Amino acid sequence: MSPKFCSPGQVQTKKCIEEVLHFAYEENLLVMADEVYQDNVYLPDCQFHSFKKVLYEMGPEYFNGVELVSFHSTSKGFTGECGFRGGYMEVLNMDPQVEAQLVKLLSVRLCPPVPGQAAMDVIVNPPKEHEPSYAQF
């Protein structure tokens, strides 16, 4: 699922995401949420909703019962950094044996480029007000 269907697409409503998560819960499905465009919502009446946050707000039964993989990347235009190759995925409630195989699969791939991973670090942990680079960020 993509809460924002590609860069020119529509933004999914919270209700739509709740319906997807409810369906995944009922059918025991893994949800893969492509959230790389979360910072590219420009209309005032549209808002990005994280699948994980919506899942949490649905209560412990859902939050602890839905397998969710959430993706984010530096390659999709946070501040014009397209071309950097860096990203991460967060795994929630995945069967430990499946997660072990996923880690194994990811471990045998080539290492990502350092500049992209450095950019990803800044996106997930931006400079704080008291830090020298805050004004430039």
Locations of regions flagged by a protein language model:
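PLP-dependent aspartate aminotransferase-fold enzymes
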Residues: 1-3
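Conserved core segment of the aminotransferase class I/II
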Residues: 53-137
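Active-site pre-lysine segment of PLP-dependent enzymes
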Residues: 5-30, 37-84, 96
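A general marker of short, structured functional hotspots
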Residues: 19, 33, 130-133
